[in-house]
Amino acid sequence: MAYNIWEEYIMANFHNVYPVVTNLFLFIALSYSFCIFVFFSFFFVKMRKVIYFFLIICLHSNVGWHPFFVFFCGVSGLYVKELQVGNYYICNLKDYANETCTVNYDYNKMIKLLCPINKSYEEYDDRYCFKFIGIRDRLVINNQEEPIMDTLPGIIIENLNMFDRYNVGIYMPFYVKEDITIVCTCESSKDSEAITPYLKIHVKANNSFNKEGEFIKGCDYGNNKGKHQFLTNTLKQEENFLCEINANPGEVVGMNCINFEEYTTTTTINNKKKKHQNKNNKNNFDVIQLRPPHCFSNVSISMSFLRVVTMNVNNLLPEAKYYPEVYSFPKDKKFQKYSTISYLWIPENVPHDILFYCHCNFPQGKGIGLFNINKTVES
C-alpha cells in the first residue's frame, strides 16, 4: 500500500517537473546554437580569403569538394603567400600585393599565380610575363621587345577571372634549350611605393624533360621553326594534311596549330614597343582551332571508315597526364593564342598499341596529328 502511494507521488511530481526540465534543456541547446552560429559567422568573415584561396586550388586541381571541407575543418587557420599541393605551386599575390614569389622550373609543376584586379590598369595579358633582366627604381624591368613565346617556345599561359582576382595558369614547356629566368608580374596600386609584385621562375635546361636538347615529339601545323620551334614535326597544312607520330611509354607528345611569328608584329607607338595582333595574318581564332575540344584530354578514335568517336584519354590510358587542364569556367580570350598548344604525358604502363588523333581546323581544311602509342614491352 505504501509502495503505491510513493509511486503515485513520484509520477505526479514527474509530470510537473518534466516540462520544466525540457524547457531548461531546450533553452541551453538554443543558447549554444546561437553562440556557435555567431562564432562561425565571425570565423567565416575573418577567414574568407583563406577559404576562397583553397577553393581555387580544388577547382584548379579537379579534385572535387572533399579537400575543401578537410582543409576548412583541419587547417583553415593557415594563411599563406606560397603553397605547394602535389605538383601544384600557388603564388598568392592577391593578398600579398607588395611581395614576391620564387620557384624553380619543373616540367611536371603546374604554376598558379593569383593577382589582384586593379581597375585603374589594363586587363591582364601575356605581356606581363617576360624574361627577367633586373630591377630598377623598385620596378621590374620589362623587356617588351622579346615576347614570352620567343623566350620559352611551347609555354602555355591562361587566365580565369574568378573571385575578384586574376587566376593565371602557367604550364612550363617540356623542352627548354637554355638556362633562363622569367617573371610574371601583378599590378600594384597607384599609391604603392613597394616593389612590383611578381613571380620569378628559375629555368634550368638540364631539368627539362629531354635533357639531350631534343624537341618534343609532336605535330606543329603552325610551322614554327628557329627560335619558336619546340615540336619535332613542323609543317604546313597546305603541304601535309597528315602528321604521324610514333611514341613509346613514358614519352611526351605535343600538338600545335598557330604560327607565332605570324601572329604578332612589332610596331612603334609613342616610341614604345608594343605587341598587337596582325589583322592581315591567317591566325583568326574563329577558324583556327584545335579539335576535339580540350585535346589531349579528349581524343578522337576511328571505329570504322565513317564512324569517329571522341572520348577522354584516360579511358584509353588511365594514368596519362594532359596539359593544359580542363576547366568548367570560361578562359580569358586574350590568351587564345596559347589555346592550340597541348601536351600528353604517356604513362609507363600501356597495355596494348593505341591509335588516336587530334586535328587543327583551318579555313582551307584540316591538319591531322595521328599518334600511335606503342604498348609496354615486358622485361
From Swiss-Prot:
Q: Alphabetically list the UniProt keywords.
A: Cell membrane, Disulfide bond, Glycoprotein, Malaria, Membrane, Repeat, Signal
Protein name listed in UniProt: Sporozoite surface protein P36
Q: What does this protein do?
A: Involved in sporozoite infection of hepatocytes and replication therein.
Kindly give the Gene3D superfamilies that the UniProt entry links to this protein: 2.60.40.2860
Secretion signal, residue range per the UniProt entry: 1-33
Which InterPro entries does the record cross-reference, listed alphabetically? 6_CYS_dom, 6_CYS_dom_sf, Parasite_Repro/Invasion_Surf
Where in or outside the cell? Cell surface; Cell membrane
Glycosylated residues (UniProt): 98, 118, 206, 298, 374
Q: What is the disulfide pattern of this chain?
A: 91-101, 115-186, 129-184, 219-243, 257-360, 295-358
Q: Does the keyword rRNA-binding apply?
A: no
Does the keyword section mention Repeat?
yes
Q: Which GO terms describe its cellular component?
A: cell surface; plasma membrane
Sorted alphabetically, which SMART domains does this protein's record hold? Answer: s48_45
The knockout note for this entry states:
Attenuated parasites that cannot commit to infection, even when they encounter with hepatocytes, resulting in continuous traversal of hepatocytes.
Q: Where is the 6-Cys domain?
A: 69-206, 215-379
